[in-house]
Amino acid sequence: MDDRDLIVMANDKVEFQQDTVALVYDFDGTLSPQAMQHYGVLPALDQTPEEFWGRVKEKRKDEGAEELLVYMKEMIDLADAKGEKLDRESFRKHGSTIEYFEGVEHWFDRIDEFAKGLAGDASISIEHYVISSGLKEMIEGCSIAKHFKSIFACEFRYDHYGHPYWPARVISDTSKTQYLFRVNKGVLDVNDSINSHMPARERAIPFDNMIYF
């Protein structure tokens, strides 16, 4: 994003014609009451949340490292030490055990139907997105994944055996704004740059049409 993007955000005189509303969700603590790693992954590694996060915070402090990088690498190291297989398939399997706040599983169909009734004859549509510091593969394996147009979350790099060996993508609280701009501009492929200026009227979903949970 550049200064022109910020100007677009501040310009309240731009008339948008887009009729899509984006509902953008964090995951842990928003859709699910616990960090997603607590479901499946940590039990498989014989770790309590207190043990795991305590060690992560200690290593973060000792090594002066980013906490998200530390927690992802710590999972790999623990799995290797225990001989526990971690790959895309196992992460998705663990994701299928994620529990939600009451009502979440039915929320998406209900709000979609509500929007249709609210719109009347207008052609308003709703799109759902996740921007999370959790693991993309786990979210892809959860029961509500089918409702999301795009899932932006942390990812691993995998070797030719399918074994994760280093973080490939980390989404911190600060960097989440980049992904809001991706939704805004309709540039959902994370390999595509969003730095080029795009006129407001060409943007897929204006910020006024976004609700962030």
Question: What positions do the PLM features span?
Answer:
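Alpha-helical substrate-recognition element adjacent to the catalytic core
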Residues: 1-164
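Noncatalytic linker/hinge segments flanking ATPase motor cores
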Residues: 63-71, 168-176, 191-197
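Conserved Lys-Pro-Asp/Glu-containing loop-to-beta segment of HAD-superfamily phosphomonoesterases
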Residues: 175-213
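Histidine/lysine/aspartate-rich catalytic loop segments that bind and position anionic ligands
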Residues: 149-185
